[in-house]
Amino acid sequence: MGLCWGSPSDSPPTTTPSSTGNISSVGTFKSSNNTTTTGTSRGSNISSNSGFSVASGEDAYPDGQILPIPNLRIFSLAELRASTRNFRSENVLGEGGFGKVFKGWLEDKTPGKQSNGTVIAVKKLNAESFQGFEEWQCEVNFLGRVSHPNLVKLLGYCLEGEELLLVYEYMQKGSLENHLFRKGSAVQPLSWEIRLKIAIGAAKGLAFLHASEKQVIYRDFKASNILLDGSYNAKISDFGLAKLGPSASQSHITTRVMGTHGYAAPEYVATGHLYVKSDVYGFGVVLAEILTGLHALDPTRPTGQHNLTEWIKPHLSERRKLRSIMDPRLEGKYPFKSAFRVAQLALKCLGPEPKNRPSMKEVVESLELIEAANEKPLERRTTRASPSIRQQQGHYRPQQLSSFRPRQNVSRAH
């Protein structure tokens, strides 16, 4: 499954969640400031020597923090029922392999303070979910210990009987996927400046994971897992497939092939060998989506264009061809020099050999240099797309999927 401290293999724990209505499987600790922190004793132990900590030296990422044990609030099921109005269908934000995600409101009980409460997102396990306790536990163990501006914040959890729930900060603008691929008056096209801002934020989140002392490989980087707050700040979500990276003496780990078609790195799909820079490939795919406004995989496109990266790689290195695949919803309002530099960076990220791809730290630096150039976007211009591109745009039907949709797992296991 995902990243569970102390569990080097993909084998699930042999025990099951307690059904006694208490939280016996989770140890509770009290700190000096009365904040409740949690650690789990089933399947994956949390301790200060778990091997997951911020790296020292120049590679350490200064904007984030890793705690020795999770620092989370324990919610009662009654609290979360009340906050979501008994999990009403109209409060559903999305649905995926784990279950449904509901919008909720927590009352602010501070004396004398007038407030409408805090908006939250509550992920509730579907009893028939194939992911279940292991993924719930991994989210608690991992997100409960990290704090970074570009990682979605886990506020707490609930474990009562068979009920497993996770409580996150609410991300007002939804997922990058919805903004890039959904059509209609309710969806506002993203400007070039916003797209670049989102790319930088997501890159910083990945760079932070890779900079930990025992590198974390995210393993499922895609547009639907990039959530946006009210100011379009990007935060990476859903860490159910994350894994600890290789030791210093190894180049990769070997594991079951899981992820999403169109985003998984070719070496991982072919061999089960997972590199830290396998994440960089996924980032390159998302950069291609940001440039084109097209989904990584779309079987409704003409033959030869189903896989976005395989189709457009030749277009990324040539200026004239790049113009023909740029997202028409940008209406030509983008500095072409910046777009070309982003395309060149995407091409490097999509390199066939992991060792030749840039690190995420280098990706962040490159994107920040592009942003710092501060070129003025061009006024609207008419670009002449090639017939195949124009035909493709006419046939494309965006996949209107939530950020919590079920994963399309690569079928091959290793």
Swiss-Prot record:
Taxonomy of the source species: Eukaryota, Viridiplantae, Streptophyta, Embryophyta, Tracheophyta
Function statement: May be involved in plant defense signaling.
Coiled-coil ranges per UniProt: none
MF annotations from Gene Ontology: ATP binding; protein serine kinase activity; protein serine/threonine kinase activity
Disordered: annotated span: 1-54, 375-414
Binding of ATP, residues: 93-101, 123
Gene: PIX13
Protein name: Probable serine/threonine-protein kinase PIX13
Source species: Arabidopsis thaliana (Mouse-ear cress)
Lipid bilayer topology: Lipid-anchor
InterPro entries: Kinase-like_dom_sf (IPR011009), Plant_Ser_Thr_Prot_Kinase (IPR050823), Prot_kinase_dom (IPR000719), Protein_kinase_ATP_BS (IPR017441), Ser-Thr/Tyr_kinase_cat_dom (IPR001245), Ser/Thr_kinase_AS (IPR008271)
Location of this chain's protein in the cell: Cell membrane; Nucleus
